[in-house]
Regions:
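Beta1-alpha1 glycine-rich phosphate/pyrophosphate-binding loop at the start
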Residues: 2-80, 176-197
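Mid-to-C-terminal Rossmann-like scaffold of FAD/NAD(P)H-dependent oxidoreductases
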Residues: 2-10, 29, 291-388
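Glycine-rich Rossmann-fold phosphate-binding loop(s) that bind the pyrophosphate
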Residues: 15-18, 135, 164-167
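Short hydrophobic core segments
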Residues: 14, 105-115, 243-253, 309, ...
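C-terminal auxiliary extensions adjacent to catalytic cores
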Residues: 361-423
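A Rossmann-like FAD-binding core segment of flavoenzymes
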Residues: 36, 81-98, 105, 179-274
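Rossmann-like NAD(P)H-binding beta-loop-alpha module
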Residues: 142-198
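FAD-site-proximal beta/loop scaffold in flavoenzymes
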Residues: 127-152, 157, 230-236, 241-314, ...
Length: 429
């Protein structure tokens, strides 16, 4: 009948982390008038910038500054926000989800953005008090409270805080605690830091830079057992080493929250499997963020997740198929005074032409890896000013044969020595 408006589609988003928050932004940029949007999140507050937890711990910013979406944000945009609630099951035949409160919420289209959880380590007695993960605002709040009272009772220990994990998150957590005046020791099972982004030489430069910021390191070792009755007293290592400590932060990576989707019969192994348009094996369910698996890969950095949000928003709002591509992403470290950049391949092989500049006194190490006159990897520490230029050359597969001798000297040198295209070549093109 004329005059009747088309019924809105019920769009239900499970999860309210960074992926869900960015996806909402992308929806609103387009047109959500055809949707009745509901967001369910297990944390009480709205979406916040999780990658800024390290600066909050370090005291370089505060909690209000990283809350991107307070409750009023959802209300003002006509979005229903159900906070502090978990989804326990997906009932695909009925097209509804069952919540931890026993309620059922219907959907026409479901988006899973349930993120990930901290990876576990094979150590005994992890139930002791003062052993934390570093994943949520609650984690940071507990660490800050502990840091404020780290000298309680005058207890003497080898270190105030033990951080497990030499990846980006572990290094940033260690730095934040050190800024609070705690004596920090970081343990990493590899022989060098950031071993998935840096070569051993760069890892050594990074270690020295962080030691200057009052962080100690134990490398090529693992915690096998925590000691204490109720509260943490110390840690025992596989090597036989023992260390007394007051608190521990475990930051050894993430595990995708795939269980909700897989229990409902969705396909996946490492995560909930999606295609290039973020669709799962059920046409009524999509997924994005750290919970997904795409061509065998999972995701922990924001850049590819932002692209996933664009891809899904285009498909749902405009029925435009803009395929997601898992492109290279550079690594940067959020530690004040430590300039680090890594992209692409980082371990030299016989296939590479290696360009290296080192200045031990200044703490500068710059390495480029070339294959067939194209940059395939860049590792910079101490001076990362040209990182984005190198990354652009890498992604564009630019032929750098003419400027290779000048690449490590900096932009002014390699741009000056780059040969302009001749007029004959231009006309021929």
């Amino acid at each position: 009948m004329a005059g009747l408006s088309k019924a809105k589609q019920k769009l239900l988003i499970v999860g309210n982390g960074m992926a869900a928050g960015r996806f909402l932004d992308e929806l609103i940029k387009r047109d959500i008038s055809g949707f009745e949007v509901t967001v369910i999140g297990d944390e009480r507050q709205g979406s916040y910038n999780r990658i800024m937890l390290s600066p909050v711990l370090a005291g370089e910013t505060d909690v209000p500054a990283i809350i991107g979406k307070p409750s009023s944000w959802y209300r003002d945009r006509g979005i229903r926000f159900v906070s502090g609630v978990q989804v326990k099951a997906i009932e695909r035949e009925q097209k509804c989800v069952l919540t931890s409160e026993g309620n059922r919420l219907r959907y026409d289209h479901l988006v899973l953005a349930v993120g990930s959880r901290p990876a576990k380590i094979p150590a005994e007695n992890q139930q002791l008090d003062n052993i934390y993960s570093f994943r949520t605002l609650r984690d940071v709040d507990r660490l800050l409270n502990k840091a404020r009272f780290h000298e309680m009772h005058g207890r003497k220990t080898d270190t105030d805080a033990l951080v497990i994990g030499g990846g980006l998150l572990g290094l940033e957590a260690a730095y934040g605690l050190a800024l609070k005046g705690l004596r920090v020791t970081l343990v990493h099972r590899s022989g060098w830091l950031l071993n998935r982004q840096l070569d051993p030489t760069a890892g050594g430069y990074l270690k020295r830079a962080l030691e200057a910021k009052n962080i100690d390191f134990i490398l090529s070792d693992e915690v096998s057992r925590f000691t204490g009755t109720h509260e943490l007293k110390g840690a025992e290592f596989k090597s036989g080493r023992e260390l007394s400590c007051k608190l521990c932060v475990i930051a050894t990576g993430i595990t995708p929250n795939k269980e909700l989707g897989l229990a409902a019969g969705l396909k996946g192994e490492r995560g909930v499997a999606v295609n290039a348009f973020m669709a799962t094996s059920d046409e009524s369910i999509s997924a994005l963020g750290e919970c997904v698996e795409f061509k065998g890969d999972t995701f922990g950095l924001v850049e590819p997740i932002w692209q996933q949000c664009i891809t899904l928003a285009e498909r749902l709002c405009h029925n435009i198929k803009l395929p997601f591509e898992n492109n290279p992403v550079p690594t940067k470290l959020k530690v004040s005074g430590v300039n680090l950049f890594s992209a692409g391949e980082y371990l030299t092989t016989d296939e590479h032409r290696e360009l290296i500049y080192q200045d031990d006194k200044a703490g500068i190490y710059r390495k480029l890896l070339l294959r067939d006159n194209r940059i395939v990897g860049a590792v910079l520490i101490g001076d990362a000013r040209d990182g984005q230029d190198y990354f652009s050359m890498l992604t564009e597969k630019k032929d750098v044969a003419e400027i290779a001798p000048f690449l490590l000297m900096g932009r002014a040198f390699y741009q000056t020595n780059e040969q302009p295209q001749s007029s004959d070549e231009t006309e021929a093109a």
